Amino acid sequence: NPYGTFAPPYADRQPVQGFSAVLPGADENSFIFMTDNGFGGQTTSADTLLSLYSVRPDFRTASGGSGKVSASDYLSGAPLARFSHPSRLTLNDVNQKLELPIQADYRFYYNDGSKPRVDSAIDFGRLLTGADLDVESVRRDRHCAMWFGDEFGPYLIKTDASGTVMRSAISLPGVYAPQHKDVVAGRAAANLAGSGGFEGMAISPRGDRLYALLEKTVDGDPTGTLRINEFDIDQERYTGNRFVYHLQAPEHAIGDMTAIYETR
């Protein structure tokens, strides 16, 4: 079966591709996984919802375990029979805080009359899709807000615990991906390649700083160097402190990033 467990069409369901980030779940046996933004790129992902899923793995070890995963309740971690609505959280901008154009603003996908109409659930709930943002990393702060690292800006996106956007998208000063709103509007030139934004993000053990790691080198920086920018969570601004990660070889790439303690 090339489609996995369920064959299309997917009535009231959505295929899910790879996981990009993970957080602790509601209990010690569950984890929260964030899916990648869509199915190939911004131009093919307008109806792909940006979601997190609660997953309960049964690790296979020397003493037992099946090595399988199952759905769990997002709020409690309790086992579920399938990945139904209680197992997931979907990002939304119902309060219109993001200050970016999103698919829910349009009648037709991509604001193109030749495309299908925007799904009513996306429209009504102002649900965020893979054409709006490319979230690759996520951290939960000490106030239970969530911070998402995006690649289209690159932007930092702040939501509450329910996935509702709390403020405008935060740009990284001086860095512009091709999809950044200022590049699209002709106000800036891109200096970061596509899919080069915040692939990895760590949070300090105190929960007061984020460290956002770019996936690609900014134009003009030494080849093979990736910027890590420090962000003050309480002040909601970049501190100006910047670090550099050196790739060992050109074909290497980074994934996620985790702080072990305050200085490492």
Where is each model-derived feature located?
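Sequence/structural signature of beta-propeller domains
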Residues: 1-264
